Curated annotation (Swiss-Prot):
It comes from the Eukaryota. Gene3D superfamilies: 6.20.200.20. Residues 49-126, 703-763, 784-850, 872-932 form the VWFC domain. The gene is CHRD. It holds the Pfam family CHRD. Cleaved by tolloid proteases; cleavage participates in dorsoventral patterning during early development. GO terms for biological process: BMP signaling pathway; dorsal/ventral pattern formation; floor plate development; negative regulation of BMP signaling pathway; negative regulation of cell migration; negative regulation of osteoblast differentiation; positive regulation of cell adhesion; positive regulation of mesenchymal cell proliferation. Its main location: secreted. Residues 168-277, 279-402, 403-524, 530-650 form the CHRD domain. This is Chordin. Dorsalizing factor. Key developmental protein that dorsalizes early vertebrate embryonic tissues by binding to ventralizing TGF-beta family bone morphogenetic proteins (BMPs) and sequestering them in latent complexes. Residues 125-138 have a biased composition (Polar residues). Belongs to the chordin family. It comes from Homo sapiens. PROSITE patterns: CHRD, VWFC_1, VWFC_2.
Length: 955
């Protein structure tokens, strides 16, 4: 049975509903039974408002189009919503996901030949624009277009930004000024599903302390601590944005403010507006006031180059330049100047009204010198009111700053002539303010020596390529090339920020290119691993034995202060939808037994997540640089891509760091030692020191468990000290649950009890390699690692699985297939019983049996007859089947006149009957019954478990 994880339940159900309306083409084989596995998706936090769907969390009243993965993709005609609980919209709690088909709600197009646009459900007429896309005449920003050329958003390969925009990605911008400050800031916000990712640049402002989002009335909706990553740049993410805030954002009523120490209520602020110019912006400028100080005056400019000529299109937004008393004029003349070192190069006149926040214009036919000054950041833009020459704002034009990361995965499938050698490449790039490009390229597994590394455009033909930079620095036998491309040019910088460039690696055997990758920007995710370390290259040549795969990938991995593993995996060249499910595993050195942790099973080429309960053995492998990240696919179930991971850490058992780690960087295979340098200390987080559990050394998680003198995070699993071999404990939200290991009967007459195992095993036949005096290397195919109880099993071993949080599953038996290393779990086949009242001999038995002496013999029959419960839970205690007891009700103690009994998993309680004469004279009159009578009283009062517990709470 395949060991691949199943898709999330909501996506699976939705896919079945969508496919169920299609006519069946024929009776096919029955679908295989899903393997027993532990729950991988995090449980919803108690009291949290929202919905969980497909591994993502959505706020109440939020709507989205479900993504079913390959080959279905995003279902644009299906709209899902997170509805509030039925018991009241004001009650906090998990919501309910409701999905419906919106295709019947599409309006009828008025034209004769409507078109179905990509990413839309309803058909629209050509040249039709919705009302939300119409802009005032003064703000109409025209994209550079030509009949023979595609627009920038459609040119080249689709990058990360375009893929994100196709999944609900929308850009907003805000000009931030203040009535009591000369500072000016610019905020760019991207809405990706239910998260806001923002990049904020500022001028003439002290270091901000917080980023504040509020409504038009000033009510604070969200605050984020400000930790500048570069000079004058702040990055952050607002996750799970509430529905009300999303409505304010789309209505352009959501405001952003920068809070400083001198202005705790906000020094500069402004509303977020949506504009289509953001999709093409590659250069920008922040305009501040010149001359005498005046507060609340400033502007920002969004610029882009034309696709067909050296013309600069721009949109300029300003505030405070026009006084309110000038509002009576219909048009106000403004003068725009382009300067270089104080020398006037160009001048434009623009007439705007006082009600419009800006205007759009074009600077045509830039000279070669002006293009060079543009990329160097030496062109200055100035704006002034012709009626008041003294009021003037200006700023230098430079390449757009962003918190996103420029990266590329190089693989053989994307080469000009596709090759399949198992090689891989990984690149990280940084564009400087002067137009220079810093590159760090890792290459592994090439068939021959690397002879050329180039940054180039998409070729029109195979022999017509425009090379922008010849990269150097890869020494013979080395894996990493680090250098600078000094002459990228304005056109090259523009194409780089538009995701239109490619990296090509040529070797002796493949001079035209053995590896090629698309350079794309990854949206900011909130973690610093991308900026602090190099990614880990993933190649088929690193798999043992090597796999000649045409795919490749790279991954960022890091450990935070809680020893939680953050990972992000990007792949390329997998071959599309026919590849099926892709899985990522973290494991130890190849050829040695040990844990194999499934990080994620996913569709497509990207995966990210957090692992909070990493095994101590894997943490030690990470610290020693012996851990591996393995990517498996349908075509290569034993591994298609692999990368070696090194994360220096001092994490201990249970997921807690007892001492501050000296370095947390990830060092990739073949990367220089500088990649493993310690990341910068984050302000506000004190250095960790040895401390008692719950002490001030680290913030305490309210869901952790304290057991045997140690703290365990939620979801952690471990062997307790009192029984390290035959017990397994789990932390489930401050509650420790320990289950004993129940051994199945061995399949041999003379089992052997190994000293390091709980259950007896059958002796294996002695192999030639096991003879004394011969070295033995353990083959990973000789055993299996079961993720349920995280233990290594010998080949041929059979056991009952432990699946947290459910505990021991005695109605299932798992078998280790030594040839493939797979774990096969199946249900126990219970025999069909001919007796009328079967019994369960032991409470932990799975199958029932006929009583001794009934004369009935078992028959082969229904599978999985073990539907009976293990016992009853009453007042926090477990009672086995058929057991009787007297309940205890605080503060009165044991209620001896009430008897409870566990039957069919439900406790039934009743008061003792005092009506029978037998009750009198037996001592019960003084203990239970108020009086004895020979007359029969009404039927005994029967109360269930909830009623008694309610009575106990009331008393």
């Amino acid at each position: 049975m395949p060991s691949l994880p199943a898709p999330p339940a909501p996506l699976l159900l939705l896919g079945l509903l969508l496919l169920g309306s299609r006519p069946a083409r024929g009776a096919g084989p029955e679908p295989p039974v899903l393997p027993i596995r532990s729950e991988k998706e995090p449980l919803p936090v108690r009291g949290a408002a929202g919905c969980t769907f497909g591994g993502k969390v959505y706020a109440l009243d939020e709507t989205w189009h479900p993504d079913l993965g390959e080959p279905f993709g995003v279902m644009r005609c299906v709209l899902c919503a997170c509805e509030a609980p039925q018991w009241g919209r004001r009650t906090r709690g998990p919501g309910r996901v409701s999905c419906k088909n919106i295709k019947p709600e599409c309006p009828t197009p008025a034209c004769g030949q409507p078109r179905q646009l990509p990413g839309h459900c309803c058909q629209t007429c050509p040249q039709e624009r919705s009302s939300s896309e119409r802009q005032p005449s003064g703000l109409s920003f025209e994209y550079p277009r030509d009949p023979e050329h595609r627009s920038y958003s459609d040119r080249g390969e689709p990058g990360a930004e375009e893929r994100a925009r196709g999944d609900g990605h929308t850009d907003f911008v805000a000009l931030l000024t203040g009535p009591r400050s000369q500072a000016v800031a610019r905020a760019r916000v991207s809405l990706l599903r239910s998260s806001l990712r923002f990049s904020i640049s500022y001028r003439r402002l002290d270091r901000p302390t917080r980023i504040r989002f509020s409504d038009s009335n000033g009510s604070v909706l969200f605050e984020h601590p400000a930790a500048p990553t570069q000079d004058g740049l702040v990055c952050g993410v607002w996750r799970a944005v509430p529905r009300l805030s999303l409505r304010l954002l789309r209505a352009e009523q959501l405001h952003v403010a920068l809070v400083t120490l001198t202005h705790p209520s906000g020094e500069v602020w402004g509303p977020l507006i949506r504009h289509r110019a953001l999709a093409a912006e590659t250069f920008s400028a922040i305009l501040t006031l010149e001359g005498p100080p005046q507060q609340g005056v400033g502007g920002i400019t969004l610029l882009t180059l034309s696709d067909t000529e050296d013309s600069l299109h721009f949109l300029l937004l300003f505030r405070g330049l026009l006084e309110p008393r000038s509002g009576g004029l219909t048009q106000v003349p403004l003068r725009l100047q382009i300067l270089h070192q104080g020398q006037l190069l160009r001048e434009l006149q623009a007439n705007v009204s006082a009600q419009e926040p800006g205007f759009a214009e074009v600077l045509p036919n830039l000279t070669v010198q002006e293009m060079d000054w543009l990329v160097l950041g030496e062109l200055q833009m100035a704006l002034e009111w012709a009626g008041r020459p003294g009021l003037r704002i200006s700023g230098h034009i430079a390449a757009r700053k962003s918190c996103d990361v420029l990266q590329s995965v190089l693989c053989g499938a994307d080469a000009l002539i596709p090759v399949q050698t198992g090689a891989a490449g990984s690149a990280s790039l940084t564009l400087l303010g002067n137009g220079s490009l810093i590159y760090q390229v890792q290459v592994v597994g090439t068939s021959s020596e690397v002879v050329a590394m180039t940054l180039e455009t998409k070729p029109q033909r195979r022999d017509q390529r425009t090379v922008l930079c010849h990269m150097a620095g890869l020494q013979p036998g080395g894996h990493t090339a680090v250098g600078i491309c000094p002459g990228l040019g304005a056109r090259g910088a523009h194409m780089l920020l538009q995701n239109e460039l490619f990296l090509n690696v040529g070797t002796k055997d493949f001079p035209d290119g053995e590896l090629r990758g698309h350079v794309a920007a990854l949206p900011y995710c909130g973690h610093s691993a991308r900026h602090d370390t190099l990614p880990v290259p993933l190649a088929g040549a690193l798999v043992l034995p090597p796999v000649k795969s045409q795919a490749a990938g790279h991954a960022w991995l890091s450990l935070d202060t809680h020893c939680h593993l953050h990972y992000e995996v990007l792949l390329a060249g997998l071959g599309g939808s026919e590849q099926g499910t892709v899985t990522a595993h973290l494991l130890g050195p190849p050829g040695t037994p040990g844990p194999r942790r499934l990080l994620k099973g996913f569709y497509g080429s990207e995966a990210q997540g957090v692992v909070k309960d990493l095994e101590p053995e894997l943490l030690r492998h990470l610290a020693k640089g012996m851990a591996s990240l393995m990517i498996t696919t349908k075509g290569s179930p034993r591994g298609e891509l692999r990368g070696q991971v090194h994360i220096a850490n001092q994490c201990e058992v249970g997921g807690l760091r007892l001492e501050a780690a000296g370095a947390e960087g990830v060092r990739a295979l073949g990367a220089p030692d500088t990649a493993s340098a310690a990341p910068p200390v984050v302000p506000g987080l004190p250095a960790l020191a040895p401390a008692k559990p719950g002490g001030p050394g680290r913030p305490r998680d309210p869901n952790t468990c304290f057991f045997e003198g140690q703290q365990r995070p939620h979801g952690a699993r471990w062997a307790p000290n009192y029984d390290p071999l035959c017990s397994l404990c789990t932390c489930q939200r401050r509650t420790v649950i320990c289950d004993p290991v129940v051994c199945p009967p061995p399949s041999c007459p003379h089992p052997v009890q190994a000293p390091d195992q709980c259950c007896p095993v059958c002796p294996e036949k002695q192999d030639v390699r096991d003879l004394p005096g011969l070295p033995r290397s353990r083959d990973p195919g000789e055993g299996c690692y079961f993720d349920g109880d995280r233990s290594w099993r010998a080949a041929g071993t059979r056991w009952h699985p432990v699946v947290p949080p459910f505990g021991l599953i005695k109605c299932a038996v798992c078998t280790c297939k030594g040839g493939t290393g797979e774990v096969h779990c199946e249900k126990v086949q219970c025999p069909r019983l001919a007796c009328a009242q079967p019994v369960r001999v032991n409470p932990t038995d799975c199958c029932k049996q006929c009583p001794v002496g009934s004369g009935a013999h078992p028959q082969l029959g229904d599978p999985m007859q073990a539907d009976g419960p293990r016992g009853c839970r009453f007042a926090g205690q477990w009672f086995p089947e058929s057991q009787s007891w007297h309940p205890s009700v605080p503060p009165f103690g044991e209620m001896s006149c009430i008897t409870c009994r566990c039957g069919a998993g439900v406790p039934h309680c009743e008061r003792d009957d005092c009506s029978l004469p037998l009750s009198c004279g037996s001592g019960k009159e003084s203990r239970c019954c108020s009086r004895c009578t020979a007359h029969r009283r009404p039927a005994p009062e029967t109360r269930t478990d909830p009623e008694l517990e309610k009575e106990a709470e009331g008393s």
